[in-house]
């Protein structure tokens, strides 16, 4: 356990705390670290026919570009923090994918044995509640999950 850590971050305060927790685990166990962020799917049903419909493709393409640029910033900051701690890490942005799905799928594909993530993301409604994505990862993961508060 703790040999291959996937740390999920959305750039929020808890996302940054999750990266810090992954740093401590990696230091203690000599772990490999993969930093992941995902972008939610973009709704594509806008103007799907009938009177008044329009071509949403340019808007969706722009949203995808904006999400990718934001993900790049999030991952660069996490990588900088890991590097400053003497830990090399890989980074990955998974576009158009719900966070829980991205976390579970990538952890399996990469053979990770531990997931580190915040108790809730930017959409979280309170520090005492477990966010829906964290709850889903906990229920679906077959590896260790560290929830950071």
Language-model segment annotations:
Residues 3-58, 81-90:
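Small/aliphatic-rich secondary-structure junction motif
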Residues 76-115:
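Structural beta-alpha unit
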């Amino acid at each position: 356990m703790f040999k291959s850590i996937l740390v999920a971050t959305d750039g929020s305060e808890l996302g940054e705390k999750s990266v810090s927790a992954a740093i401590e685990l990696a230091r203690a166990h000599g772990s490999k670290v993969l930093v992941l962020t995902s972008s939610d799917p973009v709704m594509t049903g806008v103007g799907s026919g009938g009177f008044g419909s329009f071509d949403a493709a340019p808007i969706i393409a722009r949203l995808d570009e904006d999400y990718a640029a934001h993900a790049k910033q999030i991952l660069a900051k996490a990588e900088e923090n890991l590097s400053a701690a003497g830990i090399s890490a890989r980074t990955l942005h998974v576009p158009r994918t719900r966070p829980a799905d991205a976390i579970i799928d990538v952890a399996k594909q990469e053979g990770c044995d531990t997931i580190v993530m915040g108790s809730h993301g930017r959409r979280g409604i309170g520090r005492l509640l477990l966010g829906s994505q964290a709850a889903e990862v906990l229920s679906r993961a077959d590896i260790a999950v560290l929830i950071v508060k």
